[in-house]
């Protein structure tokens, strides 16, 4: 007992010591086991801060696609909502109002039909575009299952015909979350191969891969690799033509990056709900939505595109609450931040910011191409990034360095511009996006 008392008194005395004079600072803390005793707040903070100090500076990370700065007023509002669970709308009704208003604003921005606008807008906030894509993909899969069930119930249908495996058509340059969706939800991924002339979706080849078990086609508005906008107009026309063959194939637009760019930088571009076969769109608020991570959005054309199986109602928190997200609890801060940005910037503000980004892209493209060392892979119409690769050496000589070496040298100077390999069908090409 005396030993325990002495130990407690020693710990109490240590609380008065300067941070770097305390014993805990010198103790090795591997994190392999749960700590037996706690630390003073100042020591715990210092240990965490010191370990993070070796990380890259987010503002010098030129390839993360993530917002790294917000106004002080936005940060204040988000900090005030740190302890709020957004799912508890009975206790925090303002957060659900903000979310619904953001969905309605996005439905308007994406030209949803009258039945999917205002209070009728169909969508939800998510923790990122991955969750939004899972929801969009699940909606397409369930709708496909419902169509297949109706076909089996028709007079003369072959009741003994085995059920086919659902498949999803997408280019090889999709983000990894699409691979996860197919793996998690038992969907066959059908990848349209990329090549040096098709860095994004080859629409003609995609249409040729569609069959009666295709739940939908993914069109990317802003490729992770090169920033390309895929040709959603051609995709829409193609799946429309397939209806004459009895094939009903919806389009989901992966607008993780581009859905917050195209409406402002390229307002005449056709890609959204103006096209009749686009049924759902995801967007990342923490990318060009200009909010700190993580927040994403899923917006459907209207509620008829949302299967009832996706909607759950619970009364855990004191009232009957409908939910269409995969994740249950989530912080309210990012929703508050997104609503602030929509109010603060409006169309005019977002247009000005996207125009500035496009000008920066043009400037960097000209400077990088002007060195004569690089081939530009990104397009004029697309995400405001510059994707490039080293030109082959003249005379067939072997180069002593590659894009990964270039990325390492930039990292030595404090800049994060990671190089990565292009989709597997494109051989011997790497692209550092900037």
Language-model segments: what does each one mean?
Residues 1-120:
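N-terminal entrance/gating region of PLP-dependent enzymes' catalytic architecture
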Residues 82-90, 116-124, 163-165, 189-193, ...:
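Glycine- and acidic
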Residues 291, 324-340:
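PLP-dependent aminotransferase class I/II
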Residues 276-278, 291-294, 333, 381, ...:
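Short, solvent-exposed loop/turn segments at the edges of secondary structure
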Residues 99-106, 174-179, 202-210, 327-334, ...:
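Structured alpha-helical segments in the cores of large, soluble enzyme domains
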Residues 99, 103-106, 132-141, 178, ...:
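Buried hydrophobic packing segments
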Residues 45-49, 183, 187, 194-196, ...:
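Conserved C-terminal alpha-helix-loop-beta "cap" of PLP-dependent enzymes
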Residues 124-312, 317-320:
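Conserved PLP-enzyme active-site core in the AAT-like
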């Amino acid at each position: 007992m005396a030993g325990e008392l002495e130990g407690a008194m020693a710990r109490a005395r240590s609380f008065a010591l300067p941070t770097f004079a305390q014993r805990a600072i010198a103790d090795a803390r591997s994190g392999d086991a749960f700590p037996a005793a706690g630390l003073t707040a100042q020591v715990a903070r210092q240990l965490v801060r010191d370990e993070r100090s070796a990380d890259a500076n987010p503002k010098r990370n030129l390839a993360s696609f993530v917002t790294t700065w917000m106004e002080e007023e936005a940060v204040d509002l988000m900090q005030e909502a740190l302890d709020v669970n957004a799912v508890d709308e009975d206790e925090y009704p303002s957060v659900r109002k903000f979310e619904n208003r953001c969905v309605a604003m996005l439905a308007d921005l994406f030209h949803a039909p009258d039945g999917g606008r205002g209070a009728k807008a169909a969508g939800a906030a998510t923790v990122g575009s991955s969750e939004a894509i899972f929801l969009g993909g699940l909606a397409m899969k369930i709708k496909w299952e419902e169509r297949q069930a109706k076909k089996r119930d028709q007079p003369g249908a072959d009741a003994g015909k085995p059920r086919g495996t659902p498949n999803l058509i997408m280019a090889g340059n999709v983000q990894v979350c699409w691979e996860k969706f197919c793996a998690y939800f038992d969907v066959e991924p059908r990848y349209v191969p990329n090549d040096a002339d098709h860095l994004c979706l080859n629409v003609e080849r995609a249409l040729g891969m569609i069959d009666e078990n295709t739940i939908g086609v993914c069109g990317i508005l802003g490729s992770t690799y090169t920033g390309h906008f895929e040709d959603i107009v051609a995709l829409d026309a193609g799946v429309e033509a397939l209806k004459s063959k009895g094939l009903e194939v919806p389009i989901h637009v992966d607008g993780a990056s581009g859905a917050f760019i195209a409406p402002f930088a390229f307002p005449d571009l056709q890609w959204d709900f103006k096209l009749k076969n686009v049924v759902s769109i995801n967007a990342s608020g923490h990318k060009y939505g200009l909010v700190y991570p993580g927040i994403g959005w899923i917006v459907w054309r209207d509620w008829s595109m949302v299967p009832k199986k996706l909607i759950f109602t619970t009364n855990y928190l004191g009232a009957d609450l409908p939910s269409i997200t995969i994740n249950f609890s989530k912080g309210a801060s990012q929703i508050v931040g997104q609503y602030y940005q929509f109010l603060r910037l409006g169309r005019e503000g977002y247009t000005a910011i996207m125009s500035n980004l496009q000008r920066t892209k043009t400037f960097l493209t000209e400077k990088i191409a002007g060195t004569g060392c690089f081939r530009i892979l990104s397009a004029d119409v697309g995400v405001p990034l510059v994707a490039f690769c080293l030109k082959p050496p003249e005379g067939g000589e072997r180069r002593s360095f590659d894009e990964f070496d270039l990325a390492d040298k930039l990292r030595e100077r404090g800049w994060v511009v990671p190089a990565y390999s292009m989709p597997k069908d494109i051989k011997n090409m790497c692209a550092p996006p900037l």
